[in-house]
Amino acid sequence: MTMTLTSLILALWAYAAPARETLTAARWWDLGHRIVARLADLRLTQHTRDAVRDILDGQSMADASVWADNIKNYRHDADALHYVNIPLRATAYVPSRQCPNGRCIIAAIERDRQVLADPKASRDDRAEALRFLIHFMGDLHQPLHDANNNDRGGNQRLVTFLGHDTNLHKVWDGELIDSSGVDQESYFAFLRGRMDSIDLPALERGTVVDWAMEGHRIAVEDAYGRIPRGGHIGRAYVAANRPVIDRQLIAAGVRLAKVLNEALAGYRPR
């Protein structure tokens, strides 16, 4: 089969970065995205799992989950699609203000879902939409991707975290979990076990907007609301918010599976 230029680019970038063995807080960290994808895979129907494997040409969802970050250096058209700037004091999502021209994560998820569900969409378009969707569903559940306090989602909110200088976004992108020294397999096993005690059908309820507003509330109450005076974040903040991160990763995986099961229900290999 002749590989198109788009297919070649997708393939090169899909496999360009090897899986990391330790956590890094550079973004909603790579292993966080991988864990979301692995949790989602547990909830896929066999039909959906086969469809995903076909669309990704055998690549795992975990490996596909980091593609959208790996292409940032040359795909600047997608930069604004990783987040939505809902003001911290807002009580509702207003698309005309917070997602002009559909340039936000909420609209991007819906577009990618539609491409996946479209039987007329090309294989390349479906592969790109799936890689974006896997990643964006992870980003949506990082609370600081859903809120803005005139500080670029916490990137300009300087804090000290367990004695070192950083910013609030990095804390929530991975440093909260990094501080425990956990490895991917142990953390995945822990979260998988936690799923047995959670009402997963309840997590599936709602819309993408509902889930973004849920993340916004967490940003208000937990991410910003628990910062000690002076911005010196210590163990008490970690202890209070580690369960929040755990729950968000589980929710992201469960909801990603729901979206994929629905979007690919009618998928037929070509």
How should these model regions be labeled?
Residues 7-19:
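Hydrophobic h-region of N-terminal signal peptides that target proteins for export
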